């Protein structure tokens, strides 16, 4: 079967990861003790994608948990599903990375990385046909960003032909946890551009907005935010785990969504999202889901798809529905909003249909879009980066761990290149192919920016 090895790193990654395992254990009928308590054969049919069956019918997640301090791990271990994980798969240091990317990537993290890779290798060897890896981490801190990207590049070296998918929490526009977020995030993006196949971009502020606006929660907690993310994570891998009429997997997703190798940063959304009170006033239909899924307020990261154009997009539906209706809706969206899709990739919507809806819903849809609007995200981080880097603020924390200023300059220009690439394809049209000169295009894009 097509197994996926899940790696979570740092505080944010471990908290999202823990929530994700709660969600899919619930879907597959796995109790917190690891025993099967479900009621349908479908739950077990492809359970091996995320779980390994141990002796006595116990199901163990193919998960590797890493952190540079024991705190978050302890709370995962004592959390509701803490007994699910294999104790050897908790790999942690004692020092912490102190929000310092260099500590995570070069010093503290580098000391721990071999023991993490041993566990990853062990999990990968336990698979019949490994499909790929999914990593949850944040880019603002030290461990998830520094050590997370170190792990990604090491795994890339060892398994070059497997898909590497990450769920990366970017720094939010207004809410900042750390002053040095722009540094950490820029250095991480520099790595993700080269070593990941698909990056789902998430940020806390957009998640808070969804909780306030759509779910009408007055005081959303990180638990609520992580629940949103894990709903989307579960949707992306759903068709690997349950039978469906139109299957998709990580590789199909990558092939359909990545038109140019560097542009693999995706917006994700999930529908239906309704507040508790108004659920019974809405019918769940394919048109209704399609409408909500394309709503800018539904995106889990703070860039507005209306400010750019979709290169490609993908809708993964779950539940009993007619595939014909799904196809019609997809076509309908593209025709009505044709200006928001680039015209030089015809039919750039992929859809998948999986028969089993998530717990408590009749049908749902997960949306993954490759939009040029994501450049807003990078531009914002890049501006903050430049403001600090020009004054060399906080730089001694990084150079003290052996980093070179050159690396910062490289990461900065890589990020700016990424922004102008997105801009170039946003402006490109189907006709001008002949006279379109590469260099000229990039210059124009920078002028426009």
Swiss-Prot record:
GO terms for cellular component: cytoplasm; microtubule. Residues 429-443 have a biased composition (Acidic residues). Its cofactor is Mg(2+). Keywords: Cytoplasm, Cytoskeleton, GTP-binding, Magnesium, Metal-binding, Microtubule, Nucleotide-binding. Coiled coil: none annotated. Mg(2+) binds at residue 69. GO terms for biological process: microtubule-based process. Transmembrane segments: none annotated. Residues 426-449 are annotated as: Disordered. It is found in: Cytoplasm, Cytoskeleton. GTP binds at residues 11, 69, 138, 142-144, 204, 226. GO terms for molecular function: GTP binding; GTPase activity; metal ion binding; structural constituent of cytoskeleton. It holds the Pfam family Tubulin. Tubulin is the major constituent of microtubules, a cylinder consisting of laterally associated linear protofilaments composed of alpha- and beta-tubulin heterodimers. Microtubules grow by the addition of GTP-tubulin dimers to the microtubule end, where a stabilizing cap forms. Below the cap, tubulin dimers are in GDP-bound state, owing to GTPase activity of alpha-tubulin. Dimer of alpha and beta chains. A typical microtubule is a hollow water-filled tube with an outer diameter of 25 nm and an inner diameter of 15 nM. Alpha-beta heterodimers associate head-to-tail to form protofilaments running lengthwise along the microtubule wall with the beta-tubulin subunit facing the microtubule plus end conferring a structural polarity. Microtubules usually have 13 protofilaments but different protofilament numbers can be found in some organisms and specialized cells. Belongs to the tubulin family. This is Tubulin beta chain. It comes from Eimeria tenella (Coccidian parasite). The lineage of its organism: Eukaryota, Sar, Alveolata, Apicomplexa, Conoidasida.
């Amino acid at each position: 079967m097509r197994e996926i090895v899940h790696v979570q790193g740092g505080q944010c990654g471990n908290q999202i990861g823990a929530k994700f395992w709660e969600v899919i254990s619930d879907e597959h009928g796995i109790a917190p003790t690891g025993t099967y308590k479900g009621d349908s054969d479908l739950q077990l049919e492809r359970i091996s994608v995320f779980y390994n069956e141990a002796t006595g019918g116990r199901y163990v997640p193919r998960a590797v948990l890493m952190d540079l301090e024991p705190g978050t791990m302890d709370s995962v271990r004592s959390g509701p599903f803490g007994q699910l994980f294999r104790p050897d798969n908790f790999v942690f240091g004692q020092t912490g990375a102190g929000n310092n990317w260099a500590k995570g990537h070069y010093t503290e993290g580098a000391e721990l990385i071999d023991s993490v890779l041993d566990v990853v290798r062990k999990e990968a060897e336990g698979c019949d046909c490994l499909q790929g890896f999914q990593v949850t981490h944040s880019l603002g801190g030290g461990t998830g960003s520094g050590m997370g990207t170190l792990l990604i590049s090491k795994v890339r070296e060892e398994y070059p032909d497997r898909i590497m998918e990450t769920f990366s929490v970017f720094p939010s526009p207004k809410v900042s946890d750390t002053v040095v977020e722009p540094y950490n995030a820029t250095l991480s993006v520099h790595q993700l551009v080269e070593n990941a196949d698909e990056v789902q971009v998430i940020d806390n502020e957009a998640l808070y907005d969804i909780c306030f606006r759509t779910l009408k929660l007055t005081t959303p907690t990180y638990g609520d935010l992580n629940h949103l993310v894990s709903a989307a994570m579960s949707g992306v891998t759903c068709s690997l785990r349950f039978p469906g009429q139109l299957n998709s997997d990580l590789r199909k997703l990558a092939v359909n969504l990545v038109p140019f190798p560097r542009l693999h940063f995706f917006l994700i959304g999930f529908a239906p999202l309704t507040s508790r009170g108004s659920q019974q006033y809405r019918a769940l239909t394919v048109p209704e889901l399609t409408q909500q899924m394309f709503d800018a307020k539904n995106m889990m990261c703070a860039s507005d798809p209306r400010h750019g154009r979709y290169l490609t997009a993908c809708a993964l539906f779950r539940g009993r529905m007619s595939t014909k209706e799904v196809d019609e809706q997809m076509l309908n969206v593209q025709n009505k909003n044709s200006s928001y899709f680039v015209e030089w990739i015809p039919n750039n919507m992929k859809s998948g249909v999986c028969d089993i809806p998530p717990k408590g819903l009749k049908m749902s849809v997960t949306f993954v879009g490759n939009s040029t609007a994501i450049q807003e995200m990078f531009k914002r981080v890049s501006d903050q980066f430049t403001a600090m880097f020009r004054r060399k603020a906080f730089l001694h924390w990084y150079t003290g761990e052996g980093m070179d200023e050159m690396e910062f300059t490289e990461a900065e220009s890589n990020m700016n290149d990424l922004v102008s690439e997105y801009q170039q394809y946003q402006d490109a049209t189907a006709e001008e192919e002949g006279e379109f000169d590469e260099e000229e295009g990039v210059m124009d894009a920078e002028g426009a920016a």
